[in-house]
């Protein structure tokens, strides 16, 4: 009976893995699709000349802020010791990361589905449709940003990151996956659980239309990442050492 429950948990974890990829795909389209230019936009510096544009943005900005707060709260609260201890008491310690990934994906999916644009006010706008070099610059910049994020996720062990490996190891009665990693890497993972601050920040701010809602999204998520990702000197030294080791391995080949 216990084995059956673990198998069902593993299937749920695999389903969560697939759902997370689906939501991330929607996030990529949401953040990286070039936005069309509208003459109805009002430059943020001209608000005094057209205050009605600001008034029409109130509603979307309020709701979008609530969506972001909900996502950030979920992302932080489910990492707390209180919640982790709760899963442990319920016998769901192995599913902790799967539950975290699932709830994160649900919150993000809800945010993307209900996001309200506030495009009556813009900080800047660049018409990339009329210029092939600008369009390719936009696409390549975002492509590189996503490549860094996905590459970093693979390096950081994507199945473990999304919780599949923990459930599988529990089914096979192995130790926790993190137990097989070095103490330096475990310390790094406790401070930064997924990449990449620079890559995601570039994607958030490198938009051809910086509307008020996009500015809100980019600013709040960047500040949250900066506060939540608390790397220390040991983490930096560890990553530098790993880079030196990798360069040495490549030269030796």
From Swiss-Prot:
Membrane topology according to the record: Multi-pass membrane protein
Domain of life from the UniProt record: Eukaryota
Membrane is among the record's keywords: yes
Keyword Nucleus in record: yes
Transmembrane segment boundaries: 3-30, 57-78, 97-113, 133-161, 189-207, 214-231
InterPro entries reported in the protein's UniProt record: Nurim-like (IPR033580)
Side Perinuclear space, residues: 31-56, 114-132, 208-213
GO cellular component: nuclear envelope; nuclear inner membrane
Alphabetically ordered keywords of this record: Membrane, Nucleus, Transmembrane, Transmembrane helix
Subcellular location(s) of the protein: Nucleus inner membrane
Parts of the chain on the Nuclear side: 1-2, 79-96, 162-188, 232-253
Similarity-based family: Belongs to the nurim family.
Full protein name: Nurim homolog
Organism of derivation: Drosophila pseudoobscura pseudoobscura
């Amino acid at each position: 009976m216990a084995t059956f429950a673990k198998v069902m948990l593993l299937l749920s974890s695999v389903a969560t893995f697939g759902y997370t990829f689906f939501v991330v795909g929607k996030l990529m389209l949401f953040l990286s699709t070039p936005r069309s230019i509208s003459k109805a936009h009002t430059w943020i510096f001209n608000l005094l000349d057209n205050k009605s544009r600001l008034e029409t943005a109130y509603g979307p900005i309020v709701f979008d802020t609530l969506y972001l707060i909900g996502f950030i709260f979920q992302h932080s609260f489910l990492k707390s010791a209180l919640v982790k201890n709760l899963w442990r008491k319920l016998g769901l310690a192995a599913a902790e990361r799967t539950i975290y990934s699932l709830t994160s994906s649900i919150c993000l999916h809800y945010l993307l589905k209900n996001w309200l644009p506030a495009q009556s006010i813009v900080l800047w706008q660049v018409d990339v449709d009329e210029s092939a070099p600008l369009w390719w610059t936009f696409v390549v910049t975002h492509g590189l940003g996503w490549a860094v994020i996905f590459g970093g996720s693979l390096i950081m062990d994507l199945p473990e990151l999304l919780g599949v490996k923990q459930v599988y190891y529990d089914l096979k009665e192995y130790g926790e996956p993190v137990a097989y990693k070095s103490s330096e890497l475990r310390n790094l993972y406790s401070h930064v659980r997924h990449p990449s601050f620079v890559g995601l920040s570039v994607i958030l701010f490198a938009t051809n239309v910086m509307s008020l809602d996009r500015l809100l999204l980019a600013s709040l998520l960047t500040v949250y990442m900066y506060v939540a990702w608390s790397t220390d000197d040991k983490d930096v030294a560890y990553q530098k050492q790993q880079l030196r080791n990798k360069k040495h391995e490549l030269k030796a080949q």
